[in-house]
Amino acid sequence: KAIGEPMIQLVTAQELRLNLGDDSFTGDIDDAIEEIRRDFMKPEIECVMEMVAPDGSIIDHFDGRTLNPGHAIECAWFILWEAKLRGNDPDLIRTGCQILDWMMARGWDGEYGGLFYFRDVYDKPVQEYWHDMKFWWPHNEAIIASLLALSLTGEEKYATMHQLVHDWAHSRFADKEHGELYGYLHRDGRVSVPLK
């Protein structure tokens, strides 16, 4: 099973609760967060899996070992947003920040900067040839997540994280001549395709 399903459940229930004024959707949100914690968060190896077996165990195969740092960081800010909506719920803040911390550590490229698109949970080869490219959207997710983490915790490390991702992304993805962002960079930060 994939983490996308509880993530979609979480964010959809947030929108339905807000727009319909129906607090019964909070139960759906709680269920989604519980599934993410129980099945996809792996504290023993400090990561969030993209896909797991039905029982939450890691599948030792290319697809099963794949980490998608940007997607997990998006999950972090969905949870942090719910924490904010609940009056800064400390348990949800811990969960969201833990996901953010783990996946920034797993996903940040120590040599060239930026977030890798895919990683292997055991640092084995990754199946997808674009695994080491830098896509625009994971950086946007990290900018949002780090800013939310900073606003909820006041911890300086999230200000530093936010500045790091913001500066790296804006210095490489931004088209300074025509505006907007390029979508895809090579690992070293060079524009791969000038599409927007």
List the model feature ranges, each with a label.
Residues 1-196:
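Glycan-recognition and catalytic cores of secretory/periplasmic carbohydrate-active enzymes
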